[in-house]
Regions:
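Active-site rim/loop-helix segments in enzyme catalytic domains that contact anionic ligands
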Residues: 1-71
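Metal-dependent de-N-acetylase/amidase catalytic core
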Residues: 57-212
Length: 212
């Protein structure tokens, strides 16, 4: 598994004593450490400024380059629209929305078309057709993956992002499970336990699956 991180993480803080450059360095290290927890093969940083991401041709080309380079059969990306329903009530990060749109446009047609971004061919990167895209955060997921055996890794990986945490370890765990009081939230996008609700699993991750 390879992660492609579009932005430099230089803006996500309320600490006025830290610079964008310092924060970017911290967050890059945190992402690498989180990747090690879950056994990533590689983490690629595209370096776009945090908070200002747009689904530009430049971003689409950079993502298409990584697709051709790593040749994924399944690609996972954020939902490319702002959902006003569900537990997050329209609070989706604009960078996530932009990266989702750029990724879908890179998957089709940019990564698979030899006449699109022909300079990628000059870099030795042949076209590649992704078979499936799994969308994170879609309001109507149709694919549920049992992650019960990997749940602890998910918790530990998230806890590596210390600069982004204002919650205790127990509070983070509670948010991830999707428990509210003593009851699991039934919304399929709310916590790993909520996503598993009624599906014979303890914890699940949910996606909208697109086949090409």
């Amino acid at each position: 598994v390879t992660y492609v991180v579009c932005t430099d993480g230089s803006k996500g803080t309320s600490d006025r004593d830290i610079t964008s450059e310092q924060l970017s360095e911290i967050r890059q290290k945190e992402q690498i450490n989180a990747g090690k927890v879950i056994g990533l093969k590689d983490v690629v940083f595209l370096g776009y400024p945090d908070g200002y991401l747009e689904p530009s041709l430049s971003l689409r080309k950079d993502i298409a380059r990584e697709i051709r380079k790593h040749k994924p059969g399944i690609l996972i990306c954020p939902y490319s629209m702002r959902s006003l329903d569900g537990p997050f009530q329209g609070s989706g990060h604009p960078d996530h929305i932009a990266s989702g749109e750029a990724t879908l446009s890179a998957v089709f047609p940019s990564a698979r078309g030899h006449l699109t971004f022909p300079d990628l061919l000059q870099e030795g990167l042949e076209p590649w057709a992704v078979k499936e895209v799994w969308i994170v955060g879609h309001p109507s997921p149709d694919l549920f993956i049992d992650i019960s055996s990997e749940f602890e890794k998910s918790v530990l990986a998230l806890l590596e992002h210390k600069s982004q945490m204002s919650l205790s370890d127990d509070e983070v765990r509670q948010r991830l499970t999707g428990w509210k009081g003593n009851k699991a939230h039934s919304n399929s996008n709310f916590g790993f336990k909520g996503r598993a609700h009624g599906k014979g699993m303890k914890y699940a991750e949910s996606f909208k699956r697109l086949r090409y």
